Amino acid sequence: MKILIADDSSTVRRLVAARLSADGYQVLEAADGAEAVELARSGRPDLLVLDKVMPKMDGFEVVRALREDPRTASVPIVMLTERTSEQDVLGGLGLGVEEYMPKPFSPLELSLRVRRLLARAAP
């Protein structure tokens, strides 16, 4: 299974990629929102781990773009971000984000949430 990690922090991308690679997933990485949309459309990931605050397009703009595209509309999304106000959480969930996790985060908890979402999305 393939997972796209979109975060402008290379440290966060490395941490998440290391955890998910150790779980046996193939990992794609994007450093900004526009790259995330492009990779989601071309790379066809099974799940996206997405930061809210990124250059070029923020996480909510990425979610909107992916949900409007039939090729990516059903890809599960985990929002992993420091932006955890009630307004941010409700905004993300309202756009179709399946999980909303605050930073700092537990890589093991992220791993479990990813596994659960992928199991639910499996045919």
Where on the chain are the PLM-derived regions?
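Receiver (REC) domain active-site loop signature in two-component systems and cognate sites
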Residues: 54
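Short hydrophobic/Thr-rich beta-strand motif most characteristic of the beta2 strand and flanking loop
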Residues: 24-31, 39
